[in-house]
């Protein structure tokens, strides 16, 4: 909106009169449209710039009459636009600290529209394009009808006269309509989109019927099950053999067919296409690989490379090959072979499987020969055999996050694929890539590169990041549709999950508090000790890195130890009910134990305390000590002095130095001998005239009699020195001045060294005291040794870990002894396999597994094993990453088992410990999304996503919390344990929270101010810490449990608020959502909109008709059913809205849900609402109907009207495209192959008017008549034409 500016007239001559409150009568007050400060504007000033924020603006219409002067304006002076006000007028505008008027007027912001509020009539500055907002004055929700506004503006412009220099007037726009609250609520729910449905479906190969059924129930995520793989065309050579032996199940044979079929294809760059086996742990990937090797062997491809994570797994490889009948195929472990040519006479491997680990892939000999070169040479450039990456997540960090380097293994995996381009690549892993960036090494899938939508991996990654979790889910579906991916998982049916909270016992809590206190004091001690060091800075960062990593490990140990009593109790309970126990942990504490054994010997009084040894090691090696000085002997003193002398003023000539320093007694008292050392030093290059030359010295005959000082190297006349020298000395002579200085220097040096020694000894004493305190602290023993001991010792407990030795209690019960884990009969390499066998044979009923010792180990209740007791799997320590969590869960849950395990996930009631669960939950979320097509997948049991704090919302919550604690912003929630009626409780909490954050090094440079701000706290949190949830949760561990839990609760409360708000705004990414309706019908035959050239897979556009309504009869029977079952409450029934909208009221059915006090809402047009409503909100917005007849009429009327129009009424600006509250609607879904057309759809959606329509949304929809399920991208009705046009263009290019 533009208006011609007005030249302000000269100020009125009349004297202003003061008004009440100090406001000058005739002036007007206006609130700045930018910074909202109240300004006083002189009479006649219509346009002005705010002196505070410099925003140019105008007076609003209601103040124009008061601002306009009462005399005519001179027509001769043309108006000039005002950029900034002239100084006199600038001075007339002063911010006022006055009480706000009841309805303060706002300045007009020329960049926005000015519209009156429908309720209080205040003129509002409304940004262009904003259609819904609340009035800041009276808080009524308002909506703008854009079409009416445009008509109004057009009309006002067509009737306007040529511009005159008169004061500007604002054309009156139509008042905004009051918002239909019910329409907004329904719209929000539609934007959020449906509910998260069931995650898994039972699995059977859809297009193959060869082979026996799998021995255990297998499931697939419902997203993936909605996608059909391509038609199988490959004919297996070993088909008849497999049908006879029944060695492979139907789903393992399906993998063989699709993998071999995929290996017949080539990517656009000429390399052979690869296949990804993403089956979950325990489905039988090993036997599937053996089947592939046997099939290729039959085709004459007799060389294969099998890369896995541990050399122990070669025994499993041998077993699997024997099971499928490939007994003649040799398995050659590479780690036992020399670096020479594998097919040479010495080594003699002409064919068979070379089995190696990922670490071998990057190994090289002393002579520089690498295993990678050796393998490539053995295969040859034309190699077209199998290259198997088993457990391929080991290569995951090829494309690392910012600031880190790609791993050598990741690089080697890509290199070997480049060097043998025709190899038949199999990627095989239950965890695949837990994040899309970890797919970087899967170059043979053809998802990026030549002939795809993404030129390189980074473009592919970028698209997925933008698409959110739904995009990850689509990648898995896409790969299945193109025949390059299978992903089935063992059903967790029968497996029981429970999260067990191990609350800190009283003794443990006291120990924890004492430890937190000690670490805080140690930090202060280290800070003050570092301050005495002269070169403190370089060592400082290293010291603090070690401090915080030790801090984290220490409290992690403590958390584990806190769970030992519960673990032992649960284990004994399981054993007493005829079950057996598997305990999973990550760290064994071996390093601490070995250090203690090296220090104290093989026999100890008790088990080693890991936390104590960790603290001792940190303090002993890192306490900042000043350098110990070396004492000076007499000889050293002289040498030191000479060194000092010779190093001084190297630029001065000896002759000059002699003359300057050989001072003698002057002849008269008129000459002053008070020359400062500084002066003499500065004059070294001046002329020699200023020196007094001794007449005797200058004589030729006397030159031979000069004395030479051995210290200062100067020459003196014997008679000129004080006192004079009569007999010339035969040995070294020192002048009086040097003799005096030498003694003085040595004395000072000795004092200095004594002071340094004193300081060093004081620091040493402090260090010794700290070590004494550490030794006196009551700290727990190593959890692993403790559990083994409490459950009966090594005779009863099978240990599968990576450690070499362990502490065992002596037979008399006194003291413990360190002994090797293996005996004479068993090598260290075989000890874990031996222990596993003892467990599977039932000779030991408790197994303890660590990540290092259990990779690939099967501990399920196997039908072939002696020990078929039900497994109780206790996770004492959740792994750092979900990759490892899945591997750990899969040890006890595998195919061919008599019973599924019971899982017990142990957490302490410490807020900070959830850090470890947070990482696992984050990984599980994206892991399920990518490798199993559905982000709620994880293992189909525990909901660990409740603990996912390390998300974007988590980072934002952390920042909000920090700012609130530092009192930079107001906290959006009341801190835990505080009362709104007692503000001092909040103040007290904030003080404690700041002190806690100082103690753990998050708040830096903290000081308490003096002077007028006495007691005021100052400190800062650096930007990188503001969003670092990991650091917050790690450091939180080091606080006493009380403040730790209060801080954590505050953080999660803020997170809940932010997530709730995001849901309301429709910006929360909830992955795949189900579209629910009473009737879902496919409207017409799906259109094929794109076909992939290589696989023949197509992209289809499906159009569905949904009827979401609930008839009066259905609603009545719902209510009747509740009452009949005795589940109803007095407040259940039919309600009508208190407010009318377009002359109509809305009707709902409300009944109390299981969550007491909250009501489920059913609407005639859209059925049951996702959001439940509180009783108070229900009574505020609706009134209960006593007349059923009135309820019926209103319900049926709304049911009928909503079939043809949306809730906004017949004049809705989106017209037929609007679906808000429309009972019958069309839904368009693009299904099938999505990845190749991703960019096209993204571009088309970006042009949509409604914000929620711009977002890529993945939905799942199922027809009610024939249960046809489609998963794909939702295309808003308004965008269908654009998408189809763009897709036709894409298809032409592809053709």
From Swiss-Prot:
ZnF region ranges: PHD-type: 691-741
Q: Which UniProt keywords apply?
A: Developmental protein, Metal-binding, Nucleus, Stress response, Transcription, Transcription regulation, Zinc, Zinc-finger
Give the UniProt record's GO annotations in the biological process aspect: chromatin remodeling; epigenetic regulation of gene expression; heat acclimation; positive regulation of cellular response to heat; regulation of DNA-templated transcription; response to heat
Question: Where's the motif Nuclear localization signal?
Answer: 643-650
Query: Do the record's keywords include Nucleus?
Result: yes
Tell me one Pfam family matched here: Zn_ribbon_FGT1_1
MF terms from GO for this chain are: chromatin DNA binding; histone binding; promoter-specific chromatin binding; zinc ion binding
Residue ranges of the region described as Disordered: 1-20, 68-107, 153-204, 626-688
Explain the consequences of disrupting this gene: Abnormal embryo development leading to reduced cotyledons. Reduced maintenance of heat-induced (37 degrees Celsius) gene expression leading to reduced growth and survival in heat conditions (44 degrees Celsius). Abnormal nucleosome dynamics at loci with altered maintenance of heat-induced expression. The double mutant brm-1 fgt1-1 exhibits retarted seedling development resulting in reduced development and delayed leaf initiation, as well as delayed flowering time.
Alphabetical GO CC annotations of the entry are: nucleus
Outline what the protein does: Required for normal embryo development. Necessary to acquire heat stress (HS) memory, by modulating nucleosome occupancy and regulating heat-induced gene expression. Associates globally with the nucleosome-poor regions flanking the transcription units of expressed genes. Binds to the promoter regions, primarily to the proximal promoter just upstream of the transcriptional start sites (TSS) and somewhat more weakly to the region downstream of the transcription termination site (TTS), of actively expressed genes (e.g. HSA32, HSP18.2 and HSP22.0) in a heat-dependent fashion.
**Name by which UniProt lists this protein:** Protein FORGETTER 1
Gene name in the database record: FGT1
């Amino acid at each position: 909106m533009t208006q011609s500016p007005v030249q302000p007239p000269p100020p009125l001559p009349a004297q202003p009169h003061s008004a009440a409150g100090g406001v000058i009568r005739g002036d007007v007050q206006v609130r700045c449209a930018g910074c909202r400060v109240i300004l006083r504007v002189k009479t006649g000033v219509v346009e002005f710039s705010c002196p505070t924020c410099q925003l140019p603006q105008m007076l609003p219409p209601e103040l124009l009459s008061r601002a306009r002067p009462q005399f005519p304006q001179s027509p001769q002076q043309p108006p000039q636009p005002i950029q900034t006000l002239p100084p006199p007028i600038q001075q007339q505008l002063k911010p006022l600290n006055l009480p706000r008027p009841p309805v303060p007027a706002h300045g007009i912001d020329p960049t926005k529209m000015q519209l009156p509020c429908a309720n209080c009539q205040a003129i509002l500055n409304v940004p262009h394009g904003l259609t819904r907002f609340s009035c800041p004055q009276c808080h009524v929700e308002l909506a703008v009808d854009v079409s009416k506004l445009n008509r109004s503006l057009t009309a006002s412009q067509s009737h306007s006269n040529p511009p005159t220099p008169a004061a500007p007037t604002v054309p009156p726009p139509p008042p905004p309509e009051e918002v239909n609250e019910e329409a907004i609520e329904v719209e929000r729910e539609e934007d959020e989109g449906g509910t998260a449905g069931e995650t898994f479906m039972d699995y059977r190969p859809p297009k193959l019927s060869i082979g026996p059924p799998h021995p255990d129930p297998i499931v697939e995520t419902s997203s993936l099950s909605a996608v059909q793989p391509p038609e199988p065309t490959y004919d297996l050579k070993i088909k008849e053999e497999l049908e006879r032996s029944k060695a492979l199940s139907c789903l393992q044979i399906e993998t063989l067919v699709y993998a071999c079929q995929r290996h017949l294809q080539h990517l656009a760059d000429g390399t052979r296409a690869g296949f990804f086996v993403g089956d979950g742990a325990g489905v039988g990937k090993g036997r599937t690989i053996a089947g592939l090797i046997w099939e290729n062997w039959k085709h004459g491809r007799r060389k294969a490379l099998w890369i896995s994570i541990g050399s122990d797994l070669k025994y499993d490889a041998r077993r699997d090959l024997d099971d499928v009948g490939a007994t003649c195929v040799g398995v050659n472990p590479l780690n036992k072979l020399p670096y020479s040519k594998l097919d040479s006479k010495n080594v003699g491997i002409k064919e068979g499987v070379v089995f190696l680990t990922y670490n071998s892939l990057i190994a090289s000999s002393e002579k520089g020969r690498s295993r990678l070169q050796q393998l490539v040479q053995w295969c040859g450039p034309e190699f077209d055999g199998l290259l198997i990456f088993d457990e391929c997540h080991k290569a995951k960090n090829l494309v690392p996050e910012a600031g880190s380097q790609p791993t050598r293994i990741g690089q080697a995996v890509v290199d070997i694929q480049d060097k043998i381009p025709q190899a038949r690549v199999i990627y095989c892993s239950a965890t695949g890539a837990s994040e899309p960036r970890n797919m970087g090494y899967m170059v043979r899938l053809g998802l990026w590169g030549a002939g795809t939508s993404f030129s390189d991996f980074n473009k592919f990654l970028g698209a997925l990041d933008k698409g959110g979790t739904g995009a990850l889910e689509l990648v898995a579906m896409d790969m299945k549709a193109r025949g390059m991916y299978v992903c089935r998982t063992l059903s967790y049916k029968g497996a029981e999950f429970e999260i067990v909270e191990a609350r800190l016992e009283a003794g443990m809590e006291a120990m924890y508090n004492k430890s937190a206190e000690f670490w805080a004091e140690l930090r202060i001690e280290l800070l003050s000790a570092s301050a005495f060091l002269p070169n403190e800075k370089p060592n400082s960062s290293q010291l603090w890195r070690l401090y915080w990593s030790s801090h984290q490990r220490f409290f992690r140990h403590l958390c584990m130890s806190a769970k030992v009593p519960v673990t032992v109790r649960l284990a004994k309970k399981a054993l007493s009910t005829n079950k057996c126990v598997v305990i999973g942990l990550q760290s064994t504490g071996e390093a601490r134990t070995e250090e203690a054994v090296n220090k104290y010997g093989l026999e100890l009084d008790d088990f080693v305390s890991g936390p104590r040894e960790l603290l001792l090691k940190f303090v002993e090696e890192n306490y900042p000590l000043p350098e110990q000085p070396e004492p000076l002997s007499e000889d050293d003193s002289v040498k030191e002095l000479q060194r000092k002398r010779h190093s001084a003023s190297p630029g001065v000539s000896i002759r000059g130095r002699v003359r300057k320093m050989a001072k003698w007694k002057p002849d008269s008292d008129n000459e002053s001998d008070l020359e400062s050392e500084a002066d003499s030093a500065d004059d070294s290059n001046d002329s020699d005239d200023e020196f007094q030359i001794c007449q005797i010295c200058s004589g030729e005959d006397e030159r031979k009699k000069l004395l030479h000082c051995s210290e200062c190297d100067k020459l003196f006349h014997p008679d000129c020195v004080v006192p004079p020298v009569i007999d010339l000395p035969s040995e070294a002579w020192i002048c009086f001045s040097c003799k005096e200085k030498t003694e003085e220097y040595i004395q000072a040096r000795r004092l200095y060294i004594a002071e340094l020694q004193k300081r060093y000894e004081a620091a040493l004493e402090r260090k010794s005291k700290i070590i004494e305190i550490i030794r006196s602290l009551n700290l727990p023993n190593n959890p692993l040794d403790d559990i083994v001991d409490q459950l009966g010792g090594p005779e009863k407990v099978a240990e599968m870990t990576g450690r070499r030795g362990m502490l065992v209690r002596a037979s008399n019960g006194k003291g413990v002894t360190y002994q090797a884990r293996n005996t004479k009969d068993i090598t260290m390499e075989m000890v874990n396999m031996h222990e596993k066998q003892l467990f599977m044979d039932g000779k030991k009923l408790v197994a303890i597994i660590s990540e290092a010792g259990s990779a690939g180990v099967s501990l399920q209740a196997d039908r072939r094993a002696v020990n078929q007791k039900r497994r109780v799997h206790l996770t004492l320590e959740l792994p750092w990453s979900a990759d490892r969590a899945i591997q750990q869960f899969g040890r006890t849950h595998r195919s061919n088992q008599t019973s599924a395990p019971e899982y017990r996930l142990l957490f302490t009631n410490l807020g900070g410990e959830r850090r470890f669960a947070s990482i696992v939950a984050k990984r599980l979320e994206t892991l399920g999304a990518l490798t199993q097509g559905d982000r709620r997948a994880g293992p189909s049991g525990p909901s660990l996503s409740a603990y996912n704090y390390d998300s974007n919302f988590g980072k934002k919550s952390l920042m909000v919390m920090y700012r609130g604690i530092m009192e930079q912003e107001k906290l959006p929630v009341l801190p835990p344990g505080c009362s709104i009626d007692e503000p001092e409780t909040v103040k007290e909490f904030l003080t404690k929270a700041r002190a806690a954050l100082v103690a753990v090094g998050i708040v830096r440079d903290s000081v308490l101010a003096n002077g007028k701000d006495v007691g005021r706290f100052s400190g800062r949190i650096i930007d990188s810490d503001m969003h670092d949830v990991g650091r917050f949760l790690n450091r939180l561990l080091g606080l006493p449990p009380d403040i730790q839990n209060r801080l954590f609760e505050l953080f999660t409360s803020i997170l809940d608020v932010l997530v709730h708000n995001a849901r309301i705004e429709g910006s929360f990414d909830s992955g795949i959502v189900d579209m629910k309706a009473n009737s879902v019908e496919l409207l017409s035959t799906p259109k094929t909109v794109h076909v992939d050239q290589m696989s023949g897979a197509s992209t289809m556009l499906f159009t569905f008709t949904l009827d979401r309504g609930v008839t009066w009869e259905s609603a009545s029977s719902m209510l009747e059913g509740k009452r009949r079952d005795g589940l109803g409450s007095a407040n259940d029934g039919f309600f009508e809205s208190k407010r009318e909208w377009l002359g109509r009221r809305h009707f709902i059915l409300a009944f109390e849900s299981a969550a007491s006090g909250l009501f489920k809402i059913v609407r005639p047009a859209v059925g049951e609402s996702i959001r439940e409503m509180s009783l108070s909100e229900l009574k505020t917005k609706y009134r209960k109907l006593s007349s059923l007849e009135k309820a019926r009429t209103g319900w049926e009327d709304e049911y009928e009207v909503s079939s043809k129009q949306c809730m906004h009424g017949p004049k809705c600006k989106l017209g037929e495209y609007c679906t808000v509250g429309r009972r019958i609607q069309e839904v368009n879904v693009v299904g099938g192959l999505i990845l190749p057309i991703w960019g096209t759809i993204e571009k088309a959606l970006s042009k949509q008017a409604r914000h929620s329509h711009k977002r890529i949304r993945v939905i799942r929809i199922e027809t009610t008549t024939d249960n046809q399920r489609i998963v794909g991208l939702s295309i808003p009705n308004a965008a269908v034409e654009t998408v189809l046009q763009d897709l036709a263009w894409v298809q032409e290019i592809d053709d």
